[in-house]
């Protein structure tokens, strides 16, 4: 990606959803696991994770990080993110958690309307949460990439 002529390697953010959000949190760590270390000519400046499995996150992010999660998410519970962020303390770049009341896992995806069960977990689109998350994601990226 960093070799592409249309990519400014100094203005790249990691954004992921669910399991991809775990990868996002992993690349955001100061001492990222070798598998997730970007090439030397690419440095992530910010990270945004939608409904990540926060319980699996290890180190505190070393870049500004924004986490979106639904209060009713039974796959990646919001409480796990709240607890993980509290355990990291306040030293370092900001880590912000946005919890959407009434929202489930997958709230960002319109194709999850109507909602459905997958692997014993409820997934459902929530237009209000998705619109707000989209707006806040753009604000976050503008703030940290420009």
PLM feature spans:
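Hydrophobic anchor at the start of a short beta-strand
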Residues: 12, 65, 95
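Primarily recognizes the serine-hydrolase "nucleophile elbow" in alpha/beta-hydrolase
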Residues: 1-62
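Short alpha-helix in the alpha/beta-hydrolase fold that links the catalytic acid
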Residues: 63, 77-88
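Extracytoplasmic/secreted cell-surface and envelope-processing proteins
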Residues: 57-59, 75-78
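Short beta-strand/loop motif that positions the catalytic acidic residue
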Residues: 67-69
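Acidic catalytic loop of the alpha/beta-hydrolase fold
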Residues: 72-77, 105
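Stable alpha-helical elements in mature extracytoplasmic
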Residues: 19, 80-84, 133, 137
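C-terminal catalytic histidine-bearing segment of alpha/beta-hydrolase fold enzymes
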Residues: 94-146
């Amino acid at each position: 990606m960093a070799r592409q002529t249309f990519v400014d390697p100094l203005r790249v953010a990691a954004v992921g959803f669910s399991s991809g959000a775990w990868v996002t949190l992993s690349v955001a760590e100061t001492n990222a696991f070798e598998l997730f270390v970007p090439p030397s000519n690419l440095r992530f400046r910010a990270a945004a994770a939608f409904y990540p499995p926060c319980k699996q996150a290890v180190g505190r992010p070393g870049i500004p990080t924004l986490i979106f999660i639904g209060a009713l998410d039974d796959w990646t519970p919001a409480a796990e993110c709240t607890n993980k962020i509290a355990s990291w303390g306040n030293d370092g770049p900001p880590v912000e958690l946005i919890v959407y009341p009434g929202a489930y896992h997958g709230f960002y995806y319109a194709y999850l309307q109507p909602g459905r069960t997958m692997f014993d977990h409820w997934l459902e689109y929530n237009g209000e949460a998705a619109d707000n998350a989209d707006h806040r994601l753009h604000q976050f990226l503008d703030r940290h990439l420009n």
